[in-house]
Curated annotation (Swiss-Prot):
InterPro entries: Amidase, Amidase_CS, Amidase_dom, AS_sf, GatA. This is Glutamyl-tRNA(Gln) amidotransferase subunit A. It comes from Thermosynechococcus vestitus (strain NIES-2133 / IAM M-273 / BP-1). Belongs to the amidase family. GatA subfamily. It catalyses: L-glutamyl-tRNA(Gln) + L-glutamine + ATP + H2O = L-glutaminyl-tRNA(Gln) + L-glutamate + ADP + phosphate + H(+). Allows the formation of correctly charged Gln-tRNA(Gln) through the transamidation of misacylated Glu-tRNA(Gln) in organisms which lack glutaminyl-tRNA synthetase. The reaction takes place in the presence of glutamine and ATP through an activated gamma-phospho-Glu-tRNA(Gln). Its EC number is 6.3.5.7. The lineage of its organism: Bacteria, Bacillati, Cyanobacteriota, Cyanophyceae, Acaryochloridales.
Length: 482
């Protein structure tokens, strides 16, 4: 039984009240936060007030949904009405949104309880949470290691049982890579399946919101609650949303799974490769047919992404100038100086780096050579995936080339940090769904993630394969000792 299902069972049978469950998670947060720093804001009073409302409904004999009374954490780049939303940036340190994001509105309507807002790399730009203006989030399995990024706070909170599940956002791997590093399940849905309204934009053609959860079932429940068309998001897809839990079947007879050859070569940690090989044997034993295939342009994903994403970021982040909201620098003698001082003092080094890259790529003399060419390569990557899905139902590869690295190890070398997302970035460029599921541990006791990639809107297929694998392996049952 999943964490959400077990908590729901306890509530319905009146074994525990919503207040008791919420208080237990808040106590856990208080216990481990000095070590982890998963949260930027803990909404203690609000959470207990929400729990009290759920208890009133239960006392009145009301039937409740699966998410009613379930404590969840929300990445701090999702707008929450009346609750500070910082994007882990000095620029928005005191910003309190006047509106609610669609996904958090849906969770509220489902009766879920928000216990807090989680840490991230500033404006979701990074792979370790070390770019947060408010300190990095430690890995629950080893606090000297990073939790991944940019949704490191959400991944660590789920792994450390500070919440039942969490929401993150994924632009180039920001849900899946931290999920792998922290040993939890993380899904980046098909582009447009989940509304982006109220998500503070980084790269709008790549950003997507998704669940991080302790089990595949929990992730399926959470996706079902947040997916669906939204007129407030022009890129939102008008498609029916199935009950994803119906796809959770234990055997894989007839399933064709393709191993992407380009993802098991140089640069992959040997223990990650071994875990992948063991996972492939397990999937075969469950009835799947394995096919080795090539996505020749997979390797071009990284350079393509680091032209397209910064280009979109340079446009999206132009709004932070000290005029309407957020941080405003003091001591400027005129408007131009105020703009310059605000942006110089308000943004961190990595955000400035990406704005500069993007502005350069979009400039008149370089637009064709960089941005336009990157968009053409993006199309070729999509075509590679389309050809692969003519042969198989699901593609498979490691989520990340390595397990979690030490804090401070890669901060001086941005390129080595960018390589953490080598396996995840092409999935965003193609707009496909990708899921990371735990598949073992290395010799240092650090989790390893297995990435499953599906065709457009094939989340149910990913859940099916991940669930079958999860049910025959012990990885999801292991928890960090904190």
């Amino acid at each position: 039984m999943s964490v959400i299902q077990e908590l729901h069972r306890q509530l319905v049978r009146k074994e525990r009240s919503a207040t008791e469950i919420t208080q237990a998670y808040l106590d856990r947060i208080a216990q481990v936060e000095p070590t982890l720093h998963s949260f930027l804001t803990v909404t203690r009073d609000r959470a207990l007030a929400q729990a009290a409302e759920v208890d009133k409904r239960l006392a009145a004999g009301e039937e409740i949904g699966l998410l009613t009374g379930i404590p969840l954490a929300i990445k701090d780049n999702l707008c929450t009405y009346g609750v500070r939303t910082t994007c882990a940036s000095k620029m928005l340190e005191h910003f309190v949104p006047p509106y609610e994001s669609t996904v958090t509105e849906k969770l509220q309507a489902a009766g879920a309880i928000m216990v807090g807002k989680t840490n991230l790399d500033e404006f979701a730009m990074g792979s370790s949470t070390e770019n947060s203006a408010f300190g990095f989030t430690a890995n629950p399995w080893n606090p000297e290691r990073v939790s991944g990024g940019s949704s490191g706070g959400s991944a660590a909170a789920v792994a450390a049982r500070e919440c039942a599940a969490a929401l993150g956002s994924d632009t180039g791997g920001s849900i899946r890579q931290p999920a792998a590093f922290c040993g939890v399940v993380g899904l980046k849905p098909t582009y447009g399946l989940v509304s982006r309204y109220g998500l503070v934009a980084y790269a709008s053609s790549l950003d997507q919101i998704g669940p991080l959860a302790p089990t595949v079932t929990d992730a399926a429940i959470l996706l079902g609650a947040i997916a669906g068309h939204d007129p407030k998001d022009a890129t939102s897809l008008r498609v029916p949303i199935p009950d994803y839990t119906q796809a959770l079947k234990p055997d894989l007879k007839g399933m064709r799974i393709g191993l992407i050859q380009e993802t098991v070569g140089e640069g992959v940690q040997p223990e990650v490769k071994s875990a992948l090989e063991a996972a492939l044997k397990t999937l075969e034993a469950l009835g799947a047919t394995l096919v080795e295939l090539s996505c020749p342009r997979f390797a071009y994903g990284l350079p393509t992404y680091y032209i397209i994403a910064p280009s979109e970021a340079s446009a999206n982040l132009a709004r932070y100038d000290g005029v309407n909201f957020g941080f405003r620098a003091e001591g400027a003698s005129d408007l131009l100086e105020m703009y310059m001082k605000t942006r110089a003092q308000g943004f961190g080094a990595e955000v400035k780096r990406r704005i500069m890259i993007g502005t350069y790529a979009l400039s008149a003399g370089y637009y064709d050579a960089y941005y336009l060419r990157a968009q053409k390569v993006r199309t070729l990557i999509k075509e590679d995936f389309a050809r692969a899905f003519e042969q198989v139902d699901v593609l498979i590869c490691p989520t990340a080339p390595t397990t979690a690295f030490k804090a401070g190890e890669k901060t001086a070398d941005p390129l080595s940090m960018y390589l953490s997302d080598l396996m995840t970035i092409p999935v965003n460029l193609a707009g496909l769904p990708g899921l990371s599921v735990p598949c073992g541990f290395d010799s240092n006791g650090l989790p390893i993630g297995l990435q499953l990639i599906g065709n457009v809107l094939q989340e149910a297929t990913l859940f099916h394969v991940a669930y079958a694998y999860e049910q025959t392996t012990p990885w999801h049952q292991q928890q960090p000792q904190l």
